[in-house]
């Protein structure tokens, strides 16, 4: 069935005159090629997205069509956009561990939510273990959400051991597909 629909779409794109087309002419393309911009007005990264929205590859012009009778054919017009792969995007932020920690600032990440993510196409955080030096009289690091107190303390040289301790932490570093 999918092959038949694909053949009908290709036939419509290759048709020379309006009499050869099996459906009404409308633009069909991924959402970033269409010219409706009301859905990106609230997007804080609209200026990045704007370039994609106004991009129209050479040769698409009037040749690109949308199936107007989607109910008749059993094909949803937005199915074209669903075929684009949904990738995981990572947003980074600096985390201040406070005075008495070295390094004081770490870069952590979280997954940027996207409309195409669902239970079949979801993302998860990838964690790396890092070791942080913290002063012994400060115990704020043990309350940290990234702290990994399940492991024993890593030994330090004698000169540092009385004032500092080396604590392992699991830091989120990237957003990756959950199935993989």
UniProtKB/Swiss-Prot annotation:
<keyword id="KW-1015">Disulfide bond</keyword>
<comment type="function">
    <text>PTTH is a brain secretory polypeptide of insects which stimulates the prothoracic glands to produce and release ecdysone, the steroid essential to insect development.</text>
</comment>
<keyword id="KW-0732">Signal</keyword>
<keyword id="KW-0964">Secreted</keyword>
<feature type="propeptide">
    <location>
        <begin position="16"/>
        <end position="64"/>
    </location>
</feature>
<dbReference type="InterPro" id="IPR052876">
    <property type="entry name" value="Insect_Hormone_Regulators"/>
</dbReference>
<dbReference type="GO" id="GO:0007218">
    <property type="term" value="P:neuropeptide signaling pathway"/>
</dbReference>
<comment type="subunit">
    <text>Homodimer; disulfide-linked.</text>
</comment>
<dbReference type="InterPro" id="IPR029034">
    <property type="entry name" value="Cystine-knot_cytokine"/>
</dbReference>
<protein>
    <recommendedName>
        <fullName>Prothoracicotropic hormone</fullName>
    </recommendedName>
</protein>
<feature type="disulfide bond">
    <location>
        <begin position="88"/>
        <end position="123"/>
    </location>
</feature>
<dbReference type="GO" id="GO:0018445">
    <property type="term" value="F:prothoracicotrophic hormone activity"/>
</dbReference>
<keyword id="KW-0165">Cleavage on pair of basic residues</keyword>
<dbReference type="GO" id="GO:0005576">
    <property type="term" value="C:extracellular region"/>
</dbReference>
<keyword id="KW-0527">Neuropeptide</keyword>
<keyword id="KW-0372">Hormone</keyword>
<feature type="disulfide bond">
    <location>
        <begin position="111"/>
        <end position="175"/>
    </location>
</feature>
<feature type="signal peptide">
    <location>
        <begin position="1"/>
        <end position="15"/>
    </location>
</feature>
